[in-house]
Amino acid sequence: MPWGWQEKIASAAAQDRKNFIVFILQSYNNYRNFTIFGNMKRSLILLLMAAIAFDACAPKPVVTRKDNTVDTYFGTEVPDPYRWLEDDSSEETAAWVKAQNKVTDYYLKRLPGREKLLKRLKEVANYEKVGVPFHEKNGKWYIYKNNGLQNQSVLYEMESPEDVPVVFLDPNTLSEDGTVALKGCYFSNDGRYMAYTISRSGSDWEEIYVMDARTKELLPDHIEWAKFTEAAWCGDGFYYSAYDRPGEDHAYSGKNEGHKIYYHKIGTPQSDDVLFFENPAEPLRFYQFTVNEAETMGFLYEDGADIGNNLYVKDLRKADSPFVQITRDMKNACYPVETDGELIYLFTNVDAPMNKLVVTTIGNPKVWKDLIPEWDCVLNGVSFITDGFIIANYSKDASTHAYLYDRHDGRRVEELHLPGVGSASFIAKLGEPWCYYSYSSFTTPGTIYFWNIETGDSIVYKQPKTAFDLSGFETVQVFFPSKDGTRIPMFLTYKKGIKLDGSNPVYLYGYGGFDISLSPSFSSMRVPYLEAGGIYAQVNLRGGGEYGEAWHLAGTKMNKQNVFDDFIGAAEWLIANGYTSSEKLAIVGGSNGGLLVGACMTQRPELYAVAVPQVGVMDMLRYHKFTIGWNWAPDYGTSEDSEEMFRYLLGYSPLHNLKPGTAYPATLVTTADHDDRVVPAHSFKFAATLQECNSGDKPQLIRIDSKAGHGGGKPLAKVLEEQADIYSFIMHNTGM
């Protein structure tokens, strides 16, 4: 039959059932008076019957019940009709989740090319991924490795970095579906034991187990309800941070209050653990205690009330020694990175918005000497190597630059020449002459190098062998003016020889918060999109840490709109310069980046074809009432701070700025049932309101994962399915 009608029908059916039926009816009407098309008419009648049957089988859109809940802020009434969705343990919420997932699954699983895309995602992810080797106190070397499609990376042990690795701890054996993740491992200072933390189903709640590092035997020690913790070894036990056991109904949504530090002695039950520190006067704080390798000093961290932290030191050589405060008022960041005898090396931004390294002593910890002073680039971290040098990791225009410094006088010795514009992280050890680092870029998978301090050369230690070739792609960095004229950087990755005719699909990604920097890094999940002709754009927004504390503060509290203006400016620049058009543009972000996407799609819905807010903070008036949301107040402010702050939050809160009768972009909201960082109620209420307000014909869906959390520790099998859904949704709704 003529004119490619089969392709038109397939496209209409994939878009939505209504379009499918309308297309068949229109086609039949066009041909009904032409007898030469009798066979076509019969075919169309059969297709119409099939379409009606197809429509009857499809799940109906969810109509969410509304109630009359209203909150009053400074005399202003704010309705919250979907408040009941905050109860994640109710049967009604569970039924709503099931109904929404049924609609979403029906749509996603029928997208043209999804299965082909999933197959390609598995192919490009199936290569050996290796971490940076590290040397432990028992003389052994350890390395994380994933053979390709393992759900979780495995910890291996070696006699030397060149030795054949032997499995030391395989988290894939801890669950059948890969949803138990290894979060951290901590060797005792004599090398005899290793404590490790795990999380289940992506939750922030942690459990601690202990194994004999020599025999790999699992000991009976087991700690529950730990959170945001390490295991700080001292003597024959370790310190850890935990909360009281929560109520069963709200373990994943209730406010976390009263963080405490305990000491656990090996071979005893958790019920015998000794309470080491608590502060009932300040329940909305985090506390953590760390111990140096020599077990001569302990450091107490306190944070949560402002953008920085308080730091205290305790001399463990003296019985009942007091905590001595090093920093106060929580206005700045400060933490120890190394100790040597009486010396303490502190990384801080006190009087240094771009960060610096100072040295002090345990005898007089309030007197500091600048060792690596503040520079015009952001100091991201330091690594001590041999007895005399420090590797300083800097960020310049969001990519890594590294320099070697003399530890004794702070003199800059030389630059470490990295393979290109990308990101690098270093592992070295005081007193040892080796340094390994990982390097990646948008087109270079993570590669491990050995850096020779004597020659200054970088030697490849482990380089991945992949099933794809990215030599035909390139990355450029551009700068554009935001609404107020601020110069904003953005990385673009695409096929070489691209035409700037406005026809290219773009995946625009951003974050913009909490002093977190977005640097060039590799993800195999982007490869099929790039291969299909898409452009990956990553923009460095204010609120992040790319240019120091001033850049961060420019995107917080009453300056938060700057972040959204930067992101909107990136979209407008890409369109104005011929990279794409509104019909080809997708915006994506997670967590604080989900807030970003939610705010930008409500402020400029016509600017984008697709929006994917992932695990986003959508209710800016109530976010601080769930789990650890109170900890975000230094960046956001709260609706209870002042009337001015309330009105500012109300002005951009994604949930409260969805307008009835508005045509929104094709939207896929994502969340998960065990997300106790940004509770799923944010996404639930946003999706329900979006579906109510949308007047356009583009899909408004929510994808609610099970046995998953905020993203950390998610098994690869789940990641692949999720990315297949997201990318196929984006590609279909941008015409790829």
Where are these regions (language model features)?
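Residue-level detector of structural "landmarks"
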Residues: P2-Q6, Q15, I21
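Glycine-rich His-Gly loop
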Residues: N146, N349, S440, Y509-F514, ...
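Sec-dependent N-terminal signal peptides
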Residues: S43-A51
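Beta-propeller folds
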Residues: L46, A56-V413, H417-L418, A424, ...
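Blade-level signature of beta-propeller repeat domains, shared across WD40, Kelch, NHL, RCC1
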Residues: Y436-S441, Y449-F450
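Cap/lid segment of the alpha/beta-hydrolase catalytic domain
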Residues: N172-C185, I198-S203, E217, W451-D457, ...
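Active-site-proximal cap/loop segments of hydrolase catalytic domains
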Residues: A532, Q538-M736
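Short, Lys/Arg-enriched N-terminal segments with co-localized hydrophobic residues
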Residues: K18-N39
